[in-house]
Amino acid sequence: MIKAAVVGASGYIGGELVRLLAMHPEVEITAITSRQYAGKKVHKVHPNLRGLDLRFTNDYNFDADVIFLAVPHGTSMKIIEEFLGSAKIIDMSADFRIKKELYEKYYGPHEKPELIDRFTYGLPELHRKEIKKAELVANPGCNATATILGLYPFKDLTQEAIVDLKVSSSAGGRRENIASIHPERSNVVRVYKPYHHRHEAEVLQETRVKAMFTVHSVDLVRGLLATIYFRYEGNERELLRKLLMYKDEPFVRIVTDKGGLQRYPDPKYVIGSNFIDIGFAYDSENSRVMVFSAIDNLIKGGAGQAVQNMNIMFGLKETTGLEYYPVYPV
């Protein structure tokens, strides 16, 4: 059994990690940490996990083969040296996803720049071989995951793309702020990041395409839809051929329906799963491609992708512990 610890398990992604790992047939959870909730049972914070015999601790002296760092951005770089060499590490924050120059442009100074190059970017569909050999993996951001996987097959067709993102409230994390309380958040379609979103850096690094994000908060608890626009003069068949690079990927579903409500990806149909649904439309008259990609931001955009990376790192079947379909209706 793989001994797993989750550092920062009180947040939404931390809770989903605990849920997925608790059901994983090859994993034993040895520790879940939280400074705020140390000593409390896990269901006091994550009520859906009632019956799971785990308590939060604030002690980092635990036995683990893999450590998931589910802490806020900027925290991993402060604490990571406590864990280096003791276990494989999967970092859920942005601290080690991008190279030093890009990090400083989008986030500011980095406290441990010498460690960045030791991390592998944890997008299995693109870096499976590297992840298999890695000791340190940086889990991608949710917006970046949806955009990179949607854009990557077409990266040679354009140098720029406009990306419209519709994101749910859970993407903002669990910390209290005025924008997330129900009277302010309910029924909104709110622009909150019209340009220079930090996840643009991950897209640029992975695709070499300059992606210009505009992010909207919408009235969903979980789920994310990326609509990616770029110019293209060609034929639709070639676009489909490029997208079929994913045809053997266990968690990529290519949506090609020509009619009905489900003819394009919709986050409603991936909730609770590690799937990403990708489809496209081609406006030949105006030489415009629209790629649509939908994920559950907490699963394929977070905890599920981390478990997928863990499976690869430990030589397990990649889908182990993730072999379930989305819940419906939601």
UniProtKB/Swiss-Prot annotation:
Q: Where is the active site?
A: 142
Ordered alphabetically, the record's keywords are: Amino-acid biosynthesis, Arginine biosynthesis, Cytoplasm, Lysine biosynthesis, NADP, Oxidoreductase
> For this protein, what reaction is catalysed?
[amino-group carrier protein]-C-terminal-N-(1-carboxy-5-oxopentan-1-yl)-L-glutamine + phosphate + NADP(+) = [amino-group carrier protein]-C-terminal-N-(1-carboxy-5-phosphooxy-5-oxopentan-1-yl)-L-glutamine + NADPH + H(+); [amino-group carrier protein]-C-terminal-gamma-(L-glutamyl-5-semialdehyde)-L-glutamate + phosphate + NADP(+) = [amino-group carrier protein]-C-terminal-gamma-(5-phospho-L-glutamyl)-L-glutamate + NADPH + H(+)
* SUPFAM superfamilies registered for this protein in UniProt: Glyceraldehyde-3-phosphate dehydrogenase-like, C-terminal domain, NAD(P)-binding Rossmann-fold domains
Please state the protein's primary subcellular location: cytoplasm
The EC number(s) attached to this protein equal 1.2.1.103, 1.2.1.106
Q: Where, subcellularly, is it found?
A: Cytoplasm
The name this protein goes by in its record: Putative [LysW]-L-2-aminoadipate/[LysW]-L-glutamate phosphate reductase
Q: Which gene encodes it?
A: lysY
